[in-house]
């Protein structure tokens, strides 16, 4: 496979992440509405420039009804990227729409964004630059290094936390309303050794993930396989659907760089 082929594969995977994210917002319009948790009427008050001279322009784009239209544009762009075939101009335009939408989402609200949103922006942005300058190899290197940095940062931050080191983090997360699941909570709450093992496994995997870039095929495949299973389990237990696609979208870049 060529660098272009790996880049297109990254595009298709990140497009699925974008499509899932857009659909999650579109099926819950109240969340982004004026009375929702991510209300623009409240979010625009977080920064003075959002209500200053640029306020009218932002209102025209980020008000609830127009924001839904923007989400639909992003969804259509994601579908274009998923479709078979490598049409340079349509795919470049679609990537630009995805990146612009991700940036507008960051402007609209300072809250509610997670690592998947950031990874979508990083991957799509890197691929867009690669498209514009016909430079897929630097784009793939950028994405692979960003993935290694993201995993390592998450792992080292957990390592520094006594809550994670003690094993209390897993029962704590599984008991929450947003990310929790009753059966998973009971499983780790009643078996402290399993909770500690789970926390240690996550810390070890995330902290050592940059080793996937060293060029050792067995190690790279082991870490990518572990990452795949890790994100599948998170999607099933914590409903982190976008995380799976956003982070797995970096794996073709890692394969290109390391193998």
How would you label these PLM feature ranges?
Residues 1-259:
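Alpha-helical membrane-anchoring segments
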């Amino acid at each position: 496979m060529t660098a272009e082929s790996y880049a297109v594969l990254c595009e298709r995977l990140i497009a699925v992440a974008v499509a899932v994210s857009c659909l999650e917002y579109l099926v819950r319009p109240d969340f982004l509405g004026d009375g929702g948790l991510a209300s623009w009427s409240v979010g625009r008050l977080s920064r003075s420039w959002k209500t200053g001279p640029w306020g009218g322009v932002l209102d025209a784009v980020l008000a609830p009804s127009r924001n839904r239209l923007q989400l639909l544009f992003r969804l259509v762009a994601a579908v274009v990227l998923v479709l078979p075939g490598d049409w340079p101009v349509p795919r470049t335009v679609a990537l630009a729409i995805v990146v612009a939408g991700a940036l507008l989402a960051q402007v609209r609200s300072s809250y509610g964004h997670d690592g998947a949103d950031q990874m979508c922006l990083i991957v799509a942005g890197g691929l867009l630059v690669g498209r514009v300058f016909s430079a897929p190899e630097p784009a793939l290197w950028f994405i692979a290094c960003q993935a290694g940095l993201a995993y390592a940062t998450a792992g080292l931050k957990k390592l520094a936390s006594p809550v994670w080191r003690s094993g209390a983090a897993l029962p704590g997360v599984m008991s929450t309303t947003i990310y929790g699941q009753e059966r998973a909570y009971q499983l780790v709450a009643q078996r402290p050794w399993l909770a500690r093992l789970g926390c240690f496994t996550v810390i070890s995997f995330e902290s050592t993930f940059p080793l996937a870039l060293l060029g050792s095929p067995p190690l790279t495949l082991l870490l990518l396989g572990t990452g795949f299973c890790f994100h599948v389990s998170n999607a099933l237990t914590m409903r982190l659907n976008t995380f799976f696609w956003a982070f797995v979208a970096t794996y073709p870049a890692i394969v290109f760089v390391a193998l």
